[in-house]
């Protein structure tokens, strides 16, 4: 789905407040990354840190990753409980690829303990469309007034 000039694939789940997408994969694994709108708001991303290692347990109090750009520094915690199964080293070494391809540049993969909980905790694009539209419209209005 296109909202303003931002893309939001229909097959993903979203956490609009944190500008994060979730993809539920096979075997209870979820991939996590930044939305197109999130990378735009952050500006050029120059550092992504994952303070967890593969095999480590995570929960909703755990920082899954942090992102640093010229405009923003953010630590991302999500309603995910499980075990880290993969970290995208390509993103760690070259974080600006999130700006180029936010949906092809997942950051961390977690084998979750309860997939149904993840599906309830995150929203499909239809359920959070108005939140993203509101934010995108603010950006367009700001750009037009500049």
Swiss-Prot record:
GO cellular component term of the entry, any: glycine cleavage complex
Keywords noted in UniProt: Lipoyl
Top-rank lineage group of the source organism: Archaea
Magnesium in keyword set: no
Cofactor(s), names only, from the UniProt record: (R)-lipoate
Residue numbers of N6-lipoyllysine PTMs: 71
HAMAP family given in the database record: GcvH
Quaternary structure and partners: The glycine cleavage system is composed of four proteins: P, T, L and H.
Biological role: The glycine cleavage system catalyzes the degradation of glycine. The H protein shuttles the methylamine group of glycine from the P protein to the T protein.
Protein name (Swiss-Prot/TrEMBL): Probable glycine cleavage system H protein 3
């Amino acid at each position: 789905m296109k909202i303003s000039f931002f893309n939001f694939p229909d097959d993903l789940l979203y956490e609009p407040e944190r500008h994060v997408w979730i993809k539920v994969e096979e075997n209870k694994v979820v991939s996590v990354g930044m939305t197109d709108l999130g990378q735009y708001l952050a500006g050029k991303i120059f550092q992504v840190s994952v303070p967890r290692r593969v095999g480590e347990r995570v929960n909703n109090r755990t920082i899954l990753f942090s992102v640093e750009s010229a405009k923003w520094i953010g630590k991302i915690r999500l309603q995910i409980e499980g075990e880290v199964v993969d970290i995208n080293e390509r993103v760690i070494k070259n974080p600006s690829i999130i700006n180029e391809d936010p949906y092809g540049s997942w950051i961390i993969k977690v084998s979750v303990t309860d997939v149904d909980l993840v599906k309830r905790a995150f929203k499909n694009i239809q359920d959070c469309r108005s939140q993203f539209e509101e934010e995108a419209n603010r950006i367009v209005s700001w750009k037009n007034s500049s």
